[in-house]
Amino acid sequence: DSSTSRGLGDVYKRQGNAFVAEAKRQLFGRVGIDLFAGPTETMVIADETVDAEICATDLLGQAEHGYNSPAVMLTNSKKLAVNTLSEIDRILQILPTADTARVSWRDYGEVIVCDTYDEMLNVANDIASEHVQVMTDRDDWFLENMTCYGALFLGPRTNVANGDKVIGTNHTLPTKKAGRYTGGLWVGKFLKTHSYQKILTDEAASEIGSYGSRLCMLEGFVGHAEPVSYTHLTLPTNREV
């Protein structure tokens, strides 16, 4: 039975948890999907212009999503890195969702100290995180130069939670390094393209056919070569197109 006759739509698109991802996996092929999205991911890129408490709360705010939600901080300040780790320990003592966030941070949390902004940029592009919050004295530079991510959140006011709940930008985003080759859900996912071909003159058909025939024979596709050669050799003259 076709997907339509069984009551399925043509395309399924939405964000969600592991159950949503598994449903997409089972349906993919019979219907189209937007993308396979894994556990939520967050990255904080920060320098000494921001304080450790903000970094810690933003990291743990995403770590509470589940037991396998990566949260990574990149900084060029060892002092900020140490203070952020201390703040994370403090917040986990009082966070109501600490049972989940603690496990996620323990297993998937990282603080990486880089020497330069360029190194932070390179590491961020390599990790290709789903959510990337940039809090530095050169946020726009990261916007101009980052190429691999799901969505950027620029400045300490623009935390990921606001993007989740209020701001309104797309939140079906690539995870597990998929940001290296695709973006998130966009209008193009609801469209499809078609191509068509029409050779307008006998001369063009003859020239194309001569190339096509030789290519087919070189590849060993004799059956392909037959219609190409036949059209090339037998088209009537003055044929309407």
Residue ranges and their predicted role:
Residues 1-12, 232-241:
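Single conserved hydrophobic/aromatic residue that forms the stacking wall/gate
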Residues 6, 10-70:
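Conserved NAD(P)+-binding/catalytic subdomain of aldehyde/semialdehyde dehydrogenases
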Residues 10-13, 17-19, 34, 41-44, ...:
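Structural motif
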Residues 23-25, 48-55, 92, 111-116, ...:
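A general structural motif
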Residues 25-29, 47-51, 60-68, 79, ...:
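Generic secondary-structure signature for well-ordered alpha-helical cores
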Residues 35-46, 62-85, 101-112, 129-137, ...:
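Short loop-to-beta-strand entry elements in the cores of soluble alpha/beta enzymes
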Residues 117, 125-233:
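C-terminal core of ALDH-fold dehydrogenases
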